[in-house]
Amino acid sequence: MQKSRNYYRKVKHVRILKKLKSNREDKQKYRIGVYKSLRNFYAYIFDPWKNKVITSVSTLDKSNGYKGNIVSASSLAPDLYKKMKKLNLENESYIFDRSGYLFHGRVKAFANALRDQGVKF
């Protein structure tokens, strides 16, 4: 049976998480993760000490037509930054977890928009 692209993406993601867990310096950093489907884009902040998601944003919250494009993904960055400010997390250092996706398209647009807001990763 032929394995799908999504299967290999999950294998990459597990490999990345193993590296993050083994590195002591990265254990003290919050993780910004992304997930993309065909129609929507999701981003979350993960707390490594409590092992849970602190806050998240997605294009499901927006009401502007088709939400699976680069413009919609990059428009989520200010929303996530507002939530980070509300939780006093804007000055923390982060790890950008691309979840096995290529750093291209929606993932890259979101990361660059978040860097423009002043987030360091």
UniProtKB/Swiss-Prot annotation:
Listed GO CC annotations: ribonucleoprotein complex; ribosome
UniProt xrefs under NCBIfam families: L18_bact
Gene3D superfamilies: 3.30.420.100
Name of this chain's protein: Large ribosomal subunit protein uL18
Self-association state and partner proteins as the record states: Part of the 50S ribosomal subunit; part of the 5S rRNA/L5/L18/L25 subcomplex. Contacts the 5S and 23S rRNAs.
Family, per entry: Belongs to the universal ribosomal protein uL18 family.
Described purpose of this protein according to its UniProt entry: This is one of the proteins that bind and probably mediate the attachment of the 5S RNA into the large ribosomal subunit, where it forms part of the central protuberance.
Keywords: Ribonucleoprotein, Ribosomal protein, RNA-binding, rRNA-binding
Gene Ontology molecular functions: rRNA binding; structural constituent of ribosome
Gene Ontology biological process terms from the UniProt entry: translation
InterPro entries listed in its UniProt record: Ribosomal_uL18_bac-type (IPR004389), Ribosomal_uL18_bac/euk (IPR005484)
Organism annotation: Mesomycoplasma hyopneumoniae (strain 7448) (Mycoplasma hyopneumoniae)
